[in-house]
């Protein structure tokens, strides 16, 4: 069995069906302080107290944190200062309980490393025979994409090894590259035992003779030209310290983290693994599912390391998390084309035949003189020729719509392919598809220069026949194009083969793929731990497996194969306040999903309702639905100014966009509170249209399926579904379902020492704001040559609380793609503050911001953003200076938290930690306080906690208060009466970012985006040749579209539900 099949194959199995319970035993040593107390180093340093332990071991570990890589910005907080939230006062909130948890993290022993590690700058330059030079570490613009990046990484590692072997005199005669760690970019790390010289510059040239034939085959892929050479330049940089007084400085600690990462990565830098920022995947094996004919789901892992401060001594933690990702299969492009067309037409394909049933060749008896090449795999065909012919006829007859072609174009864009007629070429001839062209091989012509120098108009079909002696079998299919600097190359699909190792982008995932990525292949905690351990030992070669040569050379080892174990807090949930001051208290021992008959605390008042029915089978039931809706809403206290028989009810076709817009515009003129859309499917295209017009025109809408609407007409059953609809409807109409309150006691346990004081301090005159980003694929740009905007912008979702923390408003806006800095903050903060002032009649004295982040590299940037927020507040009103609390939320952190002992046969809720589990990470060396919190209760799979980092704390709330407020806010989500993974403002901001992205996609379908492009180009015609024009056009384009699409956003209302 393949290793990844063994590691990840349990993901779909029954809990505990084949696995054995891991041997675990708790430490018998009593501990009063699990984290210990940080001390300054002294000449007579006592052995540090164990801050973590591992099951079955009493070995001391390290102090305390498991964050990601440190940022090197010197403007960050002093690592030795007192953490921002660390006030020496009694905790305001008491835990409901404490218990032991294990993490997906392991201790590394770095105490035996050389005290100094030399850093060598390694710069490889590709030199063509014509003198052109390309520095590989900077990347080559024409050499992008998943496949090319993997080839470049492997080639650079081979360049490093060849260079190392050419220069043994630099390493005290050593010829084994294992003594050095190369980061596959431009830095080499070597212990001072093997390298202790200072070089200003050392130059070496490598040619084909320095590599074996197999190595050169890989290296030559990045040159694309024969005769290329490589110039290697090195020089030394200041060393890095593994211990001593300089080891824990901000810059040294950051670089030491990179060293440990590079050392542990060395065994992965080969053809056996695909390394991406999102994870590492084996090239062979690890296939856990195949959603369709041309895609598969592969399992992999993510490894991160961190240097932490243990009583003044640097120590290391390694985190290993399992992951999965969809990939394209190694197939012909024609098979991919037919599979996508089958999905788009929902027909299951054209007429079926067998592989041998090919069409008769043109040319009759002369066919033997032509190359009978049939597929990318040396004569084997992987597509159905009759199906291809079927779609070719549909394309000829113009029965393939522009919408289908556009969807197909999006699926093909960015795909790396190998032209099979060039597969034997020594140079790398792979191409990246830019788009699908409506022209065919017969219709597209170009001027070809003949041997006698004359020019002749030649079709693509004629060219391949004359140049490659190949007659195209499907000359009437659309062509694919690949963009070069100043022109496009055209290729027939039948001559394209998809290269392996390419991930599928989120925007290209089908419903089936998304289903496999979420629920179907979820692993339980017991399986997750076993998988992580196997990755640790089998792939990373740690533990008792065969020696890891790089780890041995640097004298780095794993302290124990058992993961880190520590104490966790069990936080108490808030009270929920319904109508008539009715309080609903939760007992965490019974779960946090609450069922209550309490009426809405602030029921909405509805002026009128418009119902648009898109299901012709439901026409006769619309009146009954309206009566049932009014009845159930009235039971919750909602008021209607008009009777259901006076509501406007209209029947439209399931794809009538124009009619939908007309009805919504009329609803706005008539002051209608809400527009209902009843559709047969549960997730139709009309849903996106309704939500698009909701934000663009400014009218609240809600879409339900006919099945859901039918439940409103019954006397019995469907209560949960009805409740969910009404809970969503009430906030959209301006009401509030319930409020959250600070609890005094839970289950006869006092959980807050002074609830009235905490209520006044934490919630009165406090506004909570959430920022979320939705990034797309490649970076956006304005293509001047095509006069069009290429790519999708990043969408920022912003949610803000009003007078009460459970009352939310929000909006979204666009900015440059892949830009992680929040733009236009002063303007956006003004919107938030204005909404709070309008609902409360005063401005907030405290502003709490939950800002999404991806790691410690974001911290200095967030500090700068806070300064913009403060400037916006000062501009709001003279003398206005609210206190800011800014928390970075890292939802994609690879930290996991499990119970110390797991019942391997238990269900997901039994194997996971409970809602409210909080690991209090003590003051870390970077000076920011952190905690890890699990709010949700997973019904399947393994819970994914969120890491919170306190960046700014002007209001001086204690960490205990911040942890509890964060947990309480998760319960303020109004629709599902159970907490999601993050606070309500973050959850709402996340939904707003998704909604904004979907609205942009819908906008591109309904509006001719070229109109924007030409307007923007004409506006900046006078600077069209300047170097800054691309950025200027791109920013102007995004701002124009953002203002057009979001101008009528409904303020101060939960419209996105």
From Swiss-Prot:
Q: Which residues form the PAZ domain?
A: 387-500
* Sequence ranges assigned to domain Piwi in this UniProt record: 677-1001
Localization recorded for this chain is: Cytoplasm; Nucleus
Keyword Cytoplasm recorded: yes
Query: Which intervals of the chain are annotated as region Disordered?
Result: 1-89, 344-388
Specify the superkingdom. Answer: Eukaryota
Q: Name its GO BP terms in alphabetical order.
A: olfactory learning; regulation of post-transcriptional gene silencing by regulatory ncRNA; regulatory ncRNA-mediated post-transcriptional gene silencing; RNA import into nucleus
Grouped into one coarse class, the protein's main location is cytoplasm
Q: What keywords does the record list, in alphabetical order?
A: Cytoplasm, Nucleus, RNA-mediated gene silencing
**Compositionally biased intervals (Basic and acidic residues):** 67-81, 356-388
Which GO cellular component terms, listed alphabetically, does the Swiss-Prot or TrEMBL entry include?
cytoplasm; cytoplasmic ribonucleoprotein granule; nucleus; RISC complex; RNAi effector complex
User: Is Phosphoprotein included in the keywords of this UniProt record?
Assistant: no
Where does the signal sequence lie? none
Q: Where is the composition biased (Low complexity)?
A: 17-30
Q: Which Gene3D superfamilies does the annotation name?
A: 3.40.50.2300, paz domain, Ribonuclease H-like superfamily/Ribonuclease H
Return the Pfam families for the record.
HRDE1_NRDE3_N, PAZ, Piwi
InterPro entries xrefs: HRDE1/NRDE-3-like_N, PAZ_dom, PAZ_dom_sf, Piwi, RNaseH-like_sf, RNaseH_sf
Q: What outcome follows a substitution of residue 463 to A?
A: Fails to interact with siRNAs and localizes predominantly to the cytoplasm
Gene Ontology molecular function: miRNA binding; RNA endonuclease activity; single-stranded RNA binding; siRNA binding
> What does the function comment of this entry state?
Transports small interfering RNAs (siRNAs) from the cytoplasm to the nucleus. Required for RNA interference (RNAi) in nuclei. Required for exogenous RNAi-induced H3K27 methylation.
The protein's name in its UniProt record? Nuclear RNAi defective-3 protein
Which gene codes for it?
nrde-3
